Structure formats: C-alpha cells, structure tokens
Design a protein with these regions (language model features):
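Short, small-residue-rich loop/turn micro-motifs
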Residues: 72, 97-99, 202-204
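Conserved AdoMet/S-adenosylmethionine-binding subsite of the radical SAM
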Residues: 130-139, 144-212
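Short linear Ser/Thr-Pro motifs
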Residues: 58-60, 94-95, 108, 178, ...
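Flexible, acidic/Gly-rich N-terminal and inter-domain linker regions that tether
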Residues: 1-89
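Canonical Radical SAM [4Fe-4S] cluster-binding loop centered on the CxxxCxxC motif
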Residues: 84-121
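Conserved alpha-helical substructure of the radical SAM core
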Residues: 110-139
C-alpha cells in the first residue's frame, strides 16, 4: 500500500493485487483485468511477481500427498509437500537450502548448508500449492530442509505474513516449527508470545545415542 501511495495509485488497488496473487493465483499483470490498462502497464514495467519454478511434482497413489521440487532464482532447489488432512490442506515447507546441523539420520544435511531461504521463497512454496490445487491452505509446518530456528527472522516473518488476513489468514495455532534443538532461538520464539507449535526432532533421549 505504501508503494502504491508513493506513486499516487489508489489504496484499494493494493488490496486487489494481493487478492489476485494470494487468493486467485493470477501472476500475470495482463490477466488482472480489474486494473485499468495503464496500471497493468505500470505494474509490468516496475514490478515482478517472482515465484519458485516448479521442476517436478510427485503425487501419492491415493492423491492425498503431493511433493514438489522447486528451483529458486539462483538455481538452488528445495522440496515442499502438500498433505490433504481431514480438516483441510497442510503444507510442509523448507527453510534453508541444505542444513548445517549434521544430524546423521537426515538427508538434508549431507551437503551442508548452502544458504537461508528468503521470506518470499518460503511463502512461495505455499503459494505454488495454492495455485496447483486452487484450494485454501489451512496449516503450515516448517519441517522441510533446513533448521528453521537458524533462519529465525525470515521464517518468523514468513509465518506472520501467512497469518495476515489479507494474505493467507492461517491461524498461528495451525503453524508448526520443527527444530533439532537450536536452543537460543527456542527461548526467543517463546518470548514472541505467539501460539505457534514447536516440534522437537531429537530422535533419542540423550546425545550419546543421538550421535551414534
């Protein structure tokens, strides 16, 4: 809205743009026919809707689980999963390309950490599934590649935007962050006072067994 205001574009047009992207899954400005031609031209000249590129999609035999491989602008790739639950659709997103944690049972960490995903790249995984299914996404779990609490700021901002009623309106109570135990940011998340579920992926009751 602030960008539109700066360029003397009516405020309600920003809401229309958000609706096109996050609810109608229309990403080509020329297809946004509620906008006058001059605004569509201005958007095309000055703005970019950048989503991860869908590389492959795998669908389970029962059709209730879909896994996608997506590529970012720098050609790095991550996976995301859509699960159809009794209450609606849940998306599992990645938070990093690779991972630095070194958990021996996890394939994501084998090549080490390449980089953090941006806020837009995290949200983009959810938007792609919305576009594929044309269905509302009810819950999000940050349980794909990467340690979410090591990419704390981007993950939290992505969840806050997904919670925004104008964007996806997903309840914080329907969001889960999975961690292998990045303790400093566990406390930091607790201090946020948000009812986001924290899942601990420890796989053993003590470090000796876990490291074996």
């Amino acid at each position: 809205q602030s960008i539109f205001k700066t360029h003397n574009i009516q405020k309600f047009r920003a809401k229309q743009l958000i609706d096109y992207i996050y609810h109608r899954y229309i990403f080509d400005f020329e297809d946004m026919t509620q906008f006058p031609k001059d605004l569509r031209q201005w958007l095309g000249d000055n703005c970019v809707i950048s989503l991860p590129t869908l590389i492959t999609e795998s669908i389970a035999p029962d059709g209730k689980t879909r896994k996608i491989l997506v590529e970012m602008s720098d050609q790095s790739r991550v996976e995301a999963v859509l699960m159809e639950q009794h209450y609606g659709y849940s998306v599992c997103v990645s938070s990093q390309v690779g991972c630095a944690m070194g958990c021996v049972f996890c394939a994501s960490t084998q090549g080490g950490l390449y980089r953090d995903l941006t806020v837009a790249e995290i949200i983009g995984q959810v938007v792609i599934f919305g576009a594929l299914t044309k269905e509302e996404i009810h819950s999000v779990v940050v349980m794909g590649a990467g340690e979410p609490l090591q990419n704390y700021d981007n993950v939290l901002q992505a969840l806050q935007l997904l919670h925004d009623p104008m964007i996806c309106n997903i309840s914080y109570r329907k969001m889960t962050i999975s961690t292998c135990g990045w303790v400093p940011n566990i406390y930091k998340l607790a201090d946020e006072g948000l009812p986001i579920t924290l899942a601990l992926s420890l796989h053993a009751t003590n470090n000796e067994v876990r490291r074996s």
